[in-house]
Each structure stands twice: as structure tokens, then as C-alpha cells.
Amino acid sequence: MGYKSDIEIAREAVKRPIQEIGAKIGIESADLLPYGHDKAKVSQSFINSVQNRDNGHLILVTAINPTPAGEGKTTTTVGLGDGLNRIGKNAMVCIREASLGPNFGMKGGAAGGGYAQVVPMEEMNLHFTGDFHAITSAHSLLSAMIDNHIYWGNELEIDVRRVVWRRVVDMNDRALRQITASLGGVANGFPREAGFDITVASEVMAILCLAKDLKDLQERLGAMIVAYRRDRSPVFARDIKADGAMTVLLKDAMQPNIVQTLENNPAFVHGGPFANIAHGCNSVIATTTALKLCDYVVTEAGFGADLGAEKFLNIKCRKAGLAPSVVVVVATVRAMKMNGGVAKADLGAENVDAVQNGCANLGRHIENVKSFGVPVVVAINHFVTDTDAEVQAVKDYVASQGAEAVLSRHWELGSEGSAPLAEKVVEVIEKGEANFQTLYPDDMPLAEKIQAVCKGIYRADEAVMDKKILDQLKLWEDQGYGKLPVCMAKTQYSFTTDPNERGAPTGFTIPVREVRLSAGAGFIVAVCGEIMTMPGLPRKPSAEAIHLNDDGQIEGLF
């Protein structure tokens, strides 16, 4: 049988006015700032008014290491939220906003897929409510003020060779990675090397997603390091006096966006930091607000459990005082086969042996999540080519790891297909076995925190750091940054730094190439391998196929 595309399904959605969606979770019309009929922001005054309520249960959705076969983490997040509502629970989902650049690069975007989507899909993948534009503007204002300060006498004695604040644009544009700024004569300032990152890689984005309120936002913005003097002392954004104006630009962007699923259940879609050099989770303010409004909140973290879940648990939960009741690890039969050595072209053919061979990757993720004291449920995201024998092989393996796997058909059937997963998740939560703990304490030395993640999560023999890196970490400790968590930046495709090393490898080391201080966001980035903070477009970007049809509808975006 033929299946409809995501965009066809989304266009058939019978959306309810956003005021109705807000009313489902107790948000009155006066507390919604509508952007059209189907999306709105939630007012800061409403958010403040619910802070004394008890929290609901937090459910984190993560996955195995991503493969080209696709795992469907967001699709499962949305499907589980709908499934919980279907079985009579008061639930909502919290996911990230899409970055504009990749939507015109690699084909795709979308929030979920099949019959487990959040709408309005096209708007969410384009300008949405303008949050990313506001972040780009705030970041760019600081960039302009730094160069302006240097131009008008450089009172702060900034070393123009050590301006570390790069510019941003929400587009994939490799030509901007390394540039020379201020060319063209004396009137244009002092020429220096500079460069652009994509907006989601901005520290401003990470800060917006970790700040508790506007006061916290301004303090974090002011704490960002933008440059160094000749004596290597840091220059902060507050020294440039940019933090106040940046906060003004971000005032509305701090308010969570509310939209709906295909089944008219509420969803917060807010923020979208890089899952690599940042923590890859939606905003703290959206998650904490949702927990005050619903009994069950389903959220996700970028990439696999070794990156996204580790950062969610060690960074976001630590900073926001959150504790998940259960973690859902998404796996697919196709990905198990790929981890078991099957080529992508052959994934449609039954191969139980390959499924069994590929389960080691899943097993390590289950073990890792359990080490945080949180129970695990495995969601087998169903593909039409899966056979009963292959699904059973995954279930048997998961059972051998002390967890339970549930087949979920949300892509094909919506909440009807995810109801069994929802029932299992509620059953696990009601047992009350969660006893969340972070991987390392705040006062552990920074180098030991990096070792803890590399040994405890990746299962490396050790993290290799040279004297220069160790000295830098010690200096930051002496400057008062020693209690910050670490944010590992490495390939998402493997536990190692080699993206082609699948499964659950052992007997390897993790080379730490450099360390970066994100003082405003509040973490130390450990760069392992090459990090791309400004993507490029592929040979045939999807933008070539995007256009308006005769009816004014967008074609080619999905």
C-alpha cells in the first residue's frame, strides 16, 4: 500500500484555534500572545503565576547512536505524548525549534513524521515566531558593539588578535567560516580575522535555553567572554555594555511557543541549541512550565543517548533542578541491522542474525541510562519492512538487559499505535523506582569530569589531554569556573571519535583536541575531533526544489 508524505498528512490536519489548545492545560486566552490562529507565545506573567505548583512526571526520549536508517526520536516523542492523552493522561510534549539553514540544505525539517507530527509544520520549519531571528539579532548586536568599541579607542584594551566572539547567520554558508573583517580603509575599522557560525551554535542560543527568567538571562549574557586583553585577562559582554540591549531583543523570544499535534494535543516548541558544542535540548523555561501544567511531560535530547541524554541529565537537569521519572530509548530494527553490518540498500530484507549482532549498541545505552538511577523503556519504532521475528529478537535482547521493549506504530497509526508504549511508560513511572543522580559532583576537578564521561559513558580507556589543555582547565578552576559541568563535542555516530566505528567498541581512547569556556551558558566544552559550527550546503541543496505551487502552497520543503 502507498503511504502519504508527511506534508500531505500535515495539510489534512484539522487544527483547533490555539486558544482551545491552551485551555486544555489551563492557559487562558489573555495569557496567550497569538501568532495567527495556530501558534502563540505564553506570557511571562502566566509562567510566573504557576511556579508554586507541583511538578508532573518528566519523560526523556533518547535513542541509540543515529544511523542513516533514521531512528525517529522526535516522531516517537510526539507519538508518546498523543498516546498518553489517548489513555486518559494529562500530557504534553516539549521539543526544539528547527534551524532554517539545514532545511534548505539536506532534505527535511519537520517536527515528527507520519501521524505523529506537530503542526503548523511549514511555519515551524521557516520563520515560526521569529525566535531564531531575535537570537541572531542579539548576537549580531554584540558583534557590532565589540568592533565599535575597538574603533572608538579600545578603552578595554582588547587584543584584536584575540576576539573570540564570532558572528552568526541562520543559514548553511561555508564561504563565511573564515573571513577578514573591516577591510576598505581607515573608516571601516581595524582589519582582523573573523568568521561566522550558524545561529544554533551561538552561545546566546544555549543561554536562552538554560535561563530561568529574564534576570537570569541578562546575567548569563553579561558573563559571556567575547575577547582577551594582551595580558590574557577576559573581556565580558557586560564590559561592552551589550547585555541590557541584548536582553531587550530577546524578551519575547524567552516566552515558550505553544502549538498542537495532529491530534490537537498541546506542544511547547522552544529553542534549539546545537547538540554538539551545546546541550541540544529545548528550553528550561518551556520544560519547567510544562511540568507545572501537566501530569506527564515528554521531551527529547539531540542525537543518541551518549551525547543528548548525557547532556540532558548532567547539564540541563543539574542546572534546572529536574529529575526524569523514566527514559525512553528509541531503537529500530533497521538500525540494529545496520549496526550488525547490513548495507543500507539491504535493510528491507529479513536478517535476524544481523539484528542480534547489532543490539550491543542498544545494550550499552540501556546500561548507561540506568547508571543515572532512572528506569528505561525501549521503544521499537516500527517500520513497515520489520518482520515479527526481527522485532522479537530486539525484545528478547532488551529483556536480557533487564528492561522491556514495546513495539510502537505511531508513525502509521498515531496515538492508536503508541498507546501500548504509553501504558508501559505509565506503569514504569507508577512503580516509583527512579532515583536520579548525575554522573559526577559539581566539585570534581574539570579534567576528572571529562574522564568520567569518557570512561563511564563512552567506555573509553581514558581521555587523552595534553599539558596545555590540563593547564587551561586548572586556570579556569582558579578563576572560579571549576564547578561547571562539561559538554562533550564529538561525533554522534559512535561511542568513539571515529564515526564509522559502530556497535559497542572497547579498547580505545578519546583525544581531547581543545577546551572552550562557555561562561554565560555555564559549561566547559571539550572538543574531541573536528567540530563544524557552520555547515555547508550539499551538491544539490533541497532549496533547489522548494517553491510555491499555483495555489500558493509550499512544495519541496519535506
Swiss-Prot record:
Q: What is its EC number?
A: 6.3.4.3
> Keywords for this entry?
ATP-binding, Ligase, Nucleotide-binding, One-carbon metabolism
What reaction gets catalysed by this protein? (6S)-5,6,7,8-tetrahydrofolate + formate + ATP = (6R)-10-formyltetrahydrofolate + ADP + phosphate
- Identify a single GO molecular function assigned to this protein: formate-tetrahydrofolate ligase activity
* Enzyme superclass (EC): ligase
Name the SUPFAM superfamilies for this protein. Answer: P-loop containing nucleoside triphosphate hydrolases
Q: Which residues cross the membrane?
A: none
InterPro entries attached here? Formate_THF_ligase (IPR000559), Formate_THF_ligase_CS (IPR020628), P-loop_NTPase (IPR027417)
**BP-aspect Gene Ontology terms:** tetrahydrofolate interconversion
Could you say which residues bind ATP here? Answer: T67, P68, A69, G70, E71, G72, K73, T74
PROSITE patterns hit by this protein: FTHFS_1, FTHFS_2
Q: Its pathway? A: One-carbon metabolism; tetrahydrofolate interconversion
**What protein family does this chain belong to?**
Belongs to the formate--tetrahydrofolate ligase family.
Q: Which NCBIfam families match?
A: PRK13505.1
User: What name does the UniProt record give this protein?
Assistant: Formate--tetrahydrofolate ligase
